[in-house]
UniProtKB/Swiss-Prot annotation:
Gene: rplN
Species of provenance: Anoxybacillus flavithermus (strain DSM 21510 / WK1)
Protein name stated in the entry: Large ribosomal subunit protein uL14
GO molecular function: large ribosomal subunit rRNA binding; structural constituent of ribosome
PROSITE patterns: RIBOSOMAL_L14 (PS00049)
UniProt-listed Pfam families: Ribosomal_L14
Length: 122
C-alpha cells in the first residue's frame, strides 16, 4: 500500500533514482495507491545528467508493490520492493527503458507503452 510520504524506487532511466509520494490521485481523500494507480511525487535522489532533477515534482504510476495485488483467479502477485515509472500527462513514460518486471494489471489500465518496454510482465 502506497500512501503519502512513501519512498519508492524508480524503475526507468528518466534520471530519478528515488521519489517520495506527495499525493495519491483519484478521488477526494484517497489514502492508498496500488499497482496501476497514479501518484504525485517529488524526486529525492537523481543521477547527474538525467531528464528529471532532484526536487522536481512529477507524476508516476506504481508498477510494483510489496503488498501485492489479488487477481481474479484467486492468486496473489507481490514484489520485493515498491517501484514506479515517471510519466507525462498523457500517460507515456518519461524514460526510454523500464527496469525489472511489471504487473499485468498495467495493461488493463491502459499503460501499454510501459508494458511494451518492460523486460518481463508478470
Amino acid at each position: 500500500m502506497i500512501q503519502q510520504e512513501t519512498r519508492m524506487k524508480v524503475a526507468d532511466n528518466s534520471g530519478a533514482r528515488e521519489v517520495l509520494v506527495i499525493k495519491v490521485l483519484g478521488g477526494s481523500g484517497r489514502r492508498y495507491a496500488n499497482i496501476g494507480d497514479i501518484v504525485v511525487a517529488t524526486v529525492k535522489d537523481a543521477t547527474p545528467g538525467g531528464v528529471v532533477k532532484k526536487g522536481q515534482v512529477v507524476k508516476a504510476v506504481v508498477v510494483r508493490t510489496k503488498r501485492g495485488v489479488r487477481r481474479t483467479d484467486g492468486s496473489y502477485i507481490r514484489f520485493d520492493e515498491n517501484a514506479c515509472v515517471i510519466i507525462r500527462d498523457d500517460k507515456s513514460p518519461r524514460g526510454t527503458r523500464i527496469f525489472g518486471p511489471v504487473a499485468r494489471e498495467l495493461r488493463e489500465k491502459d499503460f501499454m507503452k510501459i508494458v511494451s518496454l518492460a523486460p518481463e510482465v508478470i
